[in-house]
Amino acid sequence: MDIAAQRKIDRIFGSFLCRVFSLFHIKRTRPGKTPRVDKILVILLSEMGSWVHAHAMFERIERKYPQTSVSVLLFKKNREIVNILNYVPASDILAIDPSSILTLLKDILRVWSDMRRIRFDTVIDCELFHRISSILSFLSGAAIRVGFHPHTQEGLYRGNFINRPVLYNPYQHISRQFVTLVEAIESETVPKAKRMVDVEAPPPKVTISPSEIDAMRNRLQTFWSAGVAHGRKLVLIYPGGGILPIRAWPLESFCRLSADLIQDGCCVGIIGLAEDKP
């Protein structure tokens, strides 16, 4: 299922479900203290790059709630990057396959059952533009539901059942925004966690097996043996925008950059996804 179809489903059915669930939330809401945080579910569905930016958030969770078990919910295509970053054990990863409407519905029902079985008490919804993530946070049954909310600003309607609403700040890096979501769990301000948070987490470390390193060295050796890059620095460029081509530079800009790098003595290689091939 392409991105346009996903957006259409999210806009039509997602908006309706968000409004319905908001009515249930109004009837069930009761004031009270923050429940104990024992089981956290982090929802970050579609953005592979956001998982890298979420490193500081997972560091903050581990430091602030060291005895808490953490699970993640993502789209199936991003499972590999989470395994590489090793945020949580593979057994604590819940995955949804959005490749078709049937697999999407089937996996949502399965994940719904899993969430109810695990009994999460806290859900951190890291999405900005998905209604499905806020719906899943409601279906989880968690008492604490943290997520971005426009408050008085214009923004995507994602329901009113996020009971730890965080105001998104476009002037702060998203990695800092993710840490703010963790701080909002026990925040008493309105909006939640308004103060500037400190982010001191080191860059994420990736563990690569010796066999993978050897395989890549062999590929590069084949490239070098052709004499093309002998004695020159190799610069890899990804000129595509993935599922959102609007993010990509114009192709002419990549061409000029490549020409400048070659002029400086570098060897330029082009990388990309299978669907990027002409």
Stretches found by the model and what they are:
Residues 1-278:
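Catalytic machinery of carbohydrate-active enzymes
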